[in-house]
């Protein structure tokens, strides 16, 4: 912010020199054009964004939201960096952003820990840092300015409450639910929250949690892990996938094993639950291959821009900024659930029975 003001003042001074030195009408016109161009350039906000990678459809939608929001047409110069799932790449990118003197740094961290040093460097450079999606676990919260994302723990709790209500609605005993958890990238905010939400449900309702293994948020790993678990356990009837891509892999593995995917657990089907609600994930929900899909809204760009505009205006911003999210199901067995968010606030959440019309209206 300060750099843009200084640049504008320098350009204005140069323009005044041109007016005095040339003296002619033509020179004055040229100087006015240069001054206008300088004023226009001074309004450009430079944003450096370190994205964790492109491991899932959700992540692709998240990146596109950032790119479309922080476009040149909207008055931004976006420096986008794909870290390819490596924290060391993100640390390097942040240091490059600092050297480039960007106005804001946006970071979608691969994991929660290990950021203190580089975020201190950004703070020392007086560059505001907005954390995107996953959270960071730092010794001093002042190392970042604000956070935009989803409540992963609430997502997990929503899923667990839905499963309990669904089982009750279908007359399935809690002790008859045999669950495997295909976890996300270990240590990520989404994995921590969604895993905790399931584990709380297991403790609360007495379900059988047979195994937990990471699928790394990818379809290939999700399929590999599910194939292995199906060989180890012949009584699995719920596969709890921590994102849509893992669910796609799980569905492939279940069908390849000659078993049927669906919500009719009492008659031998294996239920797949998921998170994200990507277009492909909701298509599988409509088809009944995913019985419940809890939304993890990837459209963080507009909310991040809203915060930047507030900071540009000298306004304070909230530390935590949650985006709105829904629950989608294949059928209407469950109408709503009650769950507690990360701020210990309890609320009721409607469950939307998916239709083709709803799917067609989705932005991602």
Could you tell me what each predicted segment is?
Residues 47, 90, 148-176, 221-223, ...:
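Hydrophobic alpha-helical segments within soluble ligand-binding/sensing domains
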């Amino acid at each position: 912010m300060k750099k843009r003001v200084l640049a504008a003042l320098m350009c204005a001074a140069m323009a005044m020199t041109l007016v005095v030195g040339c003296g002619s009408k033509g020179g004055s016109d040229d100087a006015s054009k240069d001054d206008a161009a300088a004023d226009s350039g001074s309004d450009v906000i430079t944003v450096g964004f370190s994205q964790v990678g492109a491991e899932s459809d959700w992540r692709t939608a998240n990146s596109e939201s950032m790119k479309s929001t922080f476009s040149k047409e909207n008055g931004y110069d976006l420096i986008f960096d794909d870290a390819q799932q490596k924290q060391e790449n993100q640390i390097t990118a942040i240091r490059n952003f600092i050297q480039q003197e960007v106005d804001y740094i946006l970071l979608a961290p691969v994991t929660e820990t290990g950021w203190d040093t580089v975020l201190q460097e950004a703070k020392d450079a007086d560059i505001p840092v907005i954390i995107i999606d996953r959270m960071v676990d730092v010794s001093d919260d002042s190392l970042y300015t604000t956070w935009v994302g989803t409540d992963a723990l609430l997502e997990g709790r929503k899923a667990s409450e839905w499963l309990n209500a669904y089982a009750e609605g279908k007359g399935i005993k809690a002790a008859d639910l045999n669950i495997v958890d295909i976890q996300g990238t270990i240590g990520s905010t989404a994995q921590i929250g969604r895993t905790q939400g399931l584990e709380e449900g297991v403790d609360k309702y007495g379900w059988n949690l047979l195994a937990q293994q990471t699928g790394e948020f990818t379809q290939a790993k999700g399929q590999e892990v599910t194939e292995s678990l199906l060989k180890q356990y012949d009584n699995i009837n719920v596969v709890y996938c921590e994102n849509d891509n893992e669910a796609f892999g799980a569905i492939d593995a279940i069908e390849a094993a000659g078993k049927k995917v669906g919500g009719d657990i009492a008659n031998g089907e294996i239920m797949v639950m998921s998170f994200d609600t990507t277009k492909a994930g909701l298509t599988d929900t409509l088809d009944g291959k995913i019985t419940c899909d809890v939304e993890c809204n990837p459209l963080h760009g507009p909310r991040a821009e809203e915060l930047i505009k507030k900071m540009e205006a000298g306004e304070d911003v909230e530390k935590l900024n949650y985006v709105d999210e829904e629950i989608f199901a294949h059928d209407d067995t469950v109408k709503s659930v009650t769950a507690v968010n990360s701020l210990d606030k309890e609320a009721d959440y409607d469950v939307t029975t998916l239709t083709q019309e709803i799917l067609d209206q989705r932005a991602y």
